[in-house]
Amino acid sequence: MSQSVESRTRIKSERYESGVIPYAKMGYWDADYVIKDTDVLALFRITPQPGVDPIEASAAIAGESSTATWTVVWTDLLTACDLYRAKAYRVDPVPNVADQYFAYIAYDIDLFEEGSIANLTASIIGNVFGFKAVKALRLEDMRMPVAYLKTFQGPATGLIVERERMDKFGRPFLGATVKPKLGLSGKNYGRVVYEGLKGGLDFLKDDENINSQPFMRWRERYLYSMEGVNKASAAAGELKGHYLNVTAATMEDMYERAEFSKVVGSVICMIDLVIGYTAIQSMAIWARKNDMILHLHRAGNSTYSRQKNHGMNFRVICKWMRMAGVDHIHAGTVVGKLEGDPLMIKGFYNTLLESETDINLPQGLFFAQNWASLRKVVPVASGGIHAGQMHQLLDYLGDDVVLQFGGGTIGHPDGIQAGATANRVALESMVMARNEGRDYVAEGPQILRDAAKTCGPLQTALDLWKDISFNYTSTDTADFVETPTANV
């Protein structure tokens, strides 16, 4: 017993020696650390500088993302520093990649302000990404403890309530983004909304960069868009909607636009990821108070999520946004024009939709996650998809998704309404085949051809886009299994 006490005393005294000592020696590395249920866990992909030991690099990341600075400071002794130090507790080499490592780090829950994504990210992705000891650093995954999740509101509406509100069950939602995204007048914009909804879509939406420009101010767009929504809903006998983008320069402007969207009768409004975490949480609170569905466009995410060795994996954004309280988020298509590895996309969708997820290394899920009853976020698939891919979309993405065909609706040679009808018929024929027990993936092209015999717009769409695909290998792919080509 006395030897153990002496050992602990020696280690503690070494830890507080004046000057610069290794982070691992300061207590930021602990291979014997016992993870607590209340710990926030993070998994970083680290590429140490030549000559830097991966354990020391991991300890440095733990230190600089929690309590450390470059030298020992005596004021540590005025805090519960042994508790508040983040602990790197495991380092594994990345399979089949030289000089990269997975570093597992645990953070005490008291390091983070309750219910604040901004405070969480200030630590986890704050200074550490510019740290000289690592050539590159990527945040791959996190585990949020239930006690911490309970301080966030989560989605106000979520998948189940949205289906009830829209009265749409047993199939994906269908939508489209107005094209061209910039340049239309308000009246022409509203006409696009009307034609798309009347043709069979559930939603039309603003794109990420349509706000309030000289060619069309926001009030004009809202009024004409909602006129189109109301006329199409009355004609179809279905509840329909249009995502009105309320993104603006200030929170005051965003609140004003959101309030007006509610006044004119919209059931859903939209924001962009680029507004920042605090603004996103603020708008989520507003949406909950005002009984509005909140759609989030992930504009800007690929600036830091696409490269495999540096930045942040999009699955982490999915987790933060579920905590923040958005109801929709763009999460990939697999078969479209944007980055989308099938296994990675599946991991994103499971993160948004499941009440609890297990470790699944092929999908990039490094931790089990209990979502503490936070509601489900509806994934949105958008970007370069068309009716001829319907069997693949249903197979990869399932029912719980919004399929958005922008160019695949508005680019139809027979007009917007015909494009919408083609997509609706393609989807319903594929869902019917699946429900009948057919192998809709293998038979997909034939199912579409059969449906097109009684739907001219679908036949035109199939003829026009039959050879269109985006067959590129993804940048961000699975580490633990061989992955199929991303964009089939």
Swiss-Prot record:
<feature type="active site" description="Proton acceptor">
    <location>
        <position position="297"/>
    </location>
</feature>
<keyword id="KW-0560">Oxidoreductase</keyword>
<feature type="binding site" description="via carbamate group">
    <location>
        <position position="205"/>
    </location>
    <ligand>
        <name>Mg(2+)</name>
    </ligand>
</feature>
<dbReference type="InterPro" id="IPR033966">
    <property type="entry name" value="RuBisCO"/>
</dbReference>
<keyword id="KW-0602">Photosynthesis</keyword>
<dbReference type="GO" id="GO:0016984">
    <property type="term" value="F:ribulose-bisphosphate carboxylase activity"/>
</dbReference>
<dbReference type="Pfam" id="PF02788">
    <property type="entry name" value="RuBisCO_large_N"/>
</dbReference>
<feature type="modified residue" description="N6-carboxylysine">
    <location>
        <position position="205"/>
    </location>
</feature>
<feature type="binding site">
    <location>
        <position position="181"/>
    </location>
    <ligand>
        <name>substrate</name>
    </ligand>
</feature>
<feature type="binding site">
    <location>
        <position position="208"/>
    </location>
    <ligand>
        <name>Mg(2+)</name>
    </ligand>
</feature>
<dbReference type="GO" id="GO:0019253">
    <property type="term" value="P:reductive pentose-phosphate cycle"/>
</dbReference>
<keyword id="KW-0503">Monooxygenase</keyword>
<dbReference type="InterPro" id="IPR020888">
    <property type="entry name" value="RuBisCO_lsuI"/>
</dbReference>
<keyword id="KW-0120">Carbon dioxide fixation</keyword>
<feature type="binding site">
    <location>
        <position position="207"/>
    </location>
    <ligand>
        <name>Mg(2+)</name>
    </ligand>
</feature>
<feature type="binding site" description="in homodimeric partner">
    <location>
        <position position="127"/>
    </location>
    <ligand>
        <name>substrate</name>
    </ligand>
</feature>
<dbReference type="GO" id="GO:0009507">
    <property type="term" value="C:chloroplast"/>
</dbReference>
<keyword id="KW-0479">Metal-binding</keyword>
<feature type="binding site">
    <location>
        <position position="382"/>
    </location>
    <ligand>
        <name>substrate</name>
    </ligand>
</feature>
<comment type="subunit">
    <text>Heterohexadecamer of 8 large chains and 8 small chains.</text>
</comment>
<feature type="binding site">
    <location>
        <position position="177"/>
    </location>
    <ligand>
        <name>substrate</name>
    </ligand>
</feature>
<dbReference type="GO" id="GO:0004497">
    <property type="term" value="F:monooxygenase activity"/>
</dbReference>
<dbReference type="Pfam" id="PF00016">
    <property type="entry name" value="RuBisCO_large"/>
</dbReference>
<feature type="binding site">
    <location>
        <position position="330"/>
    </location>
    <ligand>
        <name>substrate</name>
    </ligand>
</feature>
<dbReference type="InterPro" id="IPR036376">
    <property type="entry name" value="RuBisCO_lsu_C_sf"/>
</dbReference>
<dbReference type="InterPro" id="IPR000685">
    <property type="entry name" value="RuBisCO_lsu_C"/>
</dbReference>
<comment type="function">
    <text>RuBisCO catalyzes two reactions: the carboxylation of D-ribulose 1,5-bisphosphate, the primary event in carbon dioxide fixation, as well as the oxidative fragmentation of the pentose substrate in the photorespiration process. Both reactions occur simultaneously and in competition at the same active site.</text>
</comment>
<keyword id="KW-0113">Calvin cycle</keyword>
<keyword id="KW-0934">Plastid</keyword>
<keyword id="KW-0150">Chloroplast</keyword>
<comment type="similarity">
    <text>Belongs to the RuBisCO large chain family. Type I subfamily.</text>
</comment>
<keyword id="KW-0460">Magnesium</keyword>
<dbReference type="InterPro" id="IPR036422">
    <property type="entry name" value="RuBisCO_lsu_N_sf"/>
</dbReference>
<feature type="active site" description="Proton acceptor">
    <location>
        <position position="179"/>
    </location>
</feature>
<feature type="binding site">
    <location>
        <position position="298"/>
    </location>
    <ligand>
        <name>substrate</name>
    </ligand>
</feature>
<dbReference type="InterPro" id="IPR020878">
    <property type="entry name" value="RuBisCo_large_chain_AS"/>
</dbReference>
<feature type="site" description="Transition state stabilizer">
    <location>
        <position position="337"/>
    </location>
</feature>
<dbReference type="InterPro" id="IPR017443">
    <property type="entry name" value="RuBisCO_lsu_fd_N"/>
</dbReference>
<keyword id="KW-0601">Photorespiration</keyword>
<dbReference type="GO" id="GO:0000287">
    <property type="term" value="F:magnesium ion binding"/>
</dbReference>
<protein>
    <recommendedName>
        <fullName>Ribulose bisphosphate carboxylase large chain</fullName>
        <ecNumber>4.1.1.39</ecNumber>
    </recommendedName>
</protein>
<keyword id="KW-0456">Lyase</keyword>
